[in-house]
Amino acid sequence: MRDKISESTRNIFDTVWKRIFPFHEMILSRPAVLSYSGGKDSSLLLHFYFWLWAEKKIPVPCIYHLDHSIRFNLEQEKKILDYTESTFPFPNLFKKKNIPALSQKLGKTLEETGRAFRYKDLEKISNQYEGYIVTGHHSTDYLETVFLNLIRGGGWNSLRTLGWYEKNRFRPLFAFTEDEIKTISQSESWPIFEDESNQSNEYLRNRIRNYILPLLLQEGADPDRIYKNFHRMEKPTSKILLKEVSSHKTPSFLKIDVWVLNDLSERERKFFIDRYLRSLNLHPTTRNFFQDLMDCLKKMNSFGIENKEAWFWKSSSYDLYVIPKNSLCLKKFKLESKNMILKWNGSQKKISPGFIPGLCSPGAKIRKNGMSIEISEILRQKEIPVPVRKMLPILYREGKVDVICLSLWDPRLGDIVADRSRNFI
């Protein structure tokens, strides 16, 4: 699918893409969480990212929209959802919150309450997707915010507000000039869903927009130039980027919270799972395999399913494990006999002389609390995935199981030590 945009808009988009070169590394490597209100600015943002995706410049973004319960217009909210779902092949994360009631409870303005709730939600989602937040602020919004902050007693930092990239929030519309935004607005007929509250002079921001800014613009104020006087476009440092390539270590497995999956639509689930696979340097799931995986999850039973690259395993009541088939946890342990160092799953531990490492044999038991307990039952209770159980190191002494090395699988788990060998280390 390609966005139906004019040649002039396409040229502007291409020019803006070149302008934001310092952010290319971040944009190319991480998915965007687009904050979409339905207004003209967020509409421009959405279509710009649609163009970037169609040009294969970015990974699939997702669309976030919050219904503030201020519009009192259920039909318009439905139209927003229908529009995004029918036009953009991206996951939709639509939330509804009674902001007026919450505002009254917190003793804050509607704008402050809505912004706080929205950003808290956006931060949570961006962390889940290992992505970054994108908002539709531009230079005129910057001037509005400066005056808003100054009226409320702000100081020097009021002039430095709304940076290009801060707190994992990216604002690419600052790369568009006001003339370019006007040209696009005149060239395109994208649906606009304005919030009724934007027209009300009950709110300070709207009074600034309707009375103060027109006077400044009439006197020759240039929002683009003013913004650039106080902001520099700089490449995000390695601390800001989620992961440094030089220090990145692919984990041996990942766990996906099933409660998070249950709250997502099927399209969002695929996006979410594919993000986890990407973190493991694996390819996205095929449509058929993903459907098989969803069918297994719906049954609420334990299951194990595999494709060419990974195992997907879940017990009846716990999270979904994703284990690459080349994972260290699926390879046999190694023993440095000289120093008696046991290595497995990227971890290691020193063992005492007299212990012989091995694997769990069928029906093997360990003496614990005066009882002989099957090791397979212990591993099941500890939620060790079935493919891993076969490779988990066991320490034997005199032909009997003495230690189940759970700490090599997960450092948070203690080793299971047989009754007669508590002092082995």
Curated annotation (Swiss-Prot):
Subcellular location: Cytoplasm
Entry binding sites for ATP: 37-42
A Pfam family this chain is assigned to: ATP_bind_3
Gene Ontology BP annotations: tRNA modification
Keywords: ATP-binding, Cytoplasm, Ligase, Nucleotide-binding, tRNA processing
Molecular functions (GO terms): ATP binding; tRNA(Ile)-lysidine synthase activity
EC code: 6.3.4.19
Catalyzed chemical reaction(s): cytidine(34) in tRNA(Ile2) + L-lysine + ATP = lysidine(34) in tRNA(Ile2) + AMP + diphosphate + H(+)
Presence of the UniProt keyword Oxidoreductase in the record: no
Entries under SUPFAM superfamilies matching the protein: Adenine nucleotide alpha hydrolases-like (SSF52402)
Superkingdom to which the source organism belongs: Bacteria
Cellular component per GO, a single term: cytoplasm
NCBIfam families per the UniProt record, alphabetical: lysidine_TilS_N
Family, as annotated: Belongs to the tRNA(Ile)-lysidine synthase family.
Role noted for this protein: Ligates lysine onto the cytidine present at position 34 of the AUA codon-specific tRNA(Ile) that contains the anticodon CAU, in an ATP-dependent manner. Cytidine is converted to lysidine, thus changing the amino acid specificity of the tRNA from methionine to isoleucine.
Domain notes: The N-terminal region contains the highly conserved SGGXDS motif, predicted to be a P-loop motif involved in ATP binding.
Name of protein: tRNA(Ile)-lysidine synthase
Organism in which the protein naturally occurs: Leptospira borgpetersenii serovar Hardjo-bovis (strain JB197)
Lineage: Bacteria, Pseudomonadati, Spirochaetota, Spirochaetia, Leptospirales
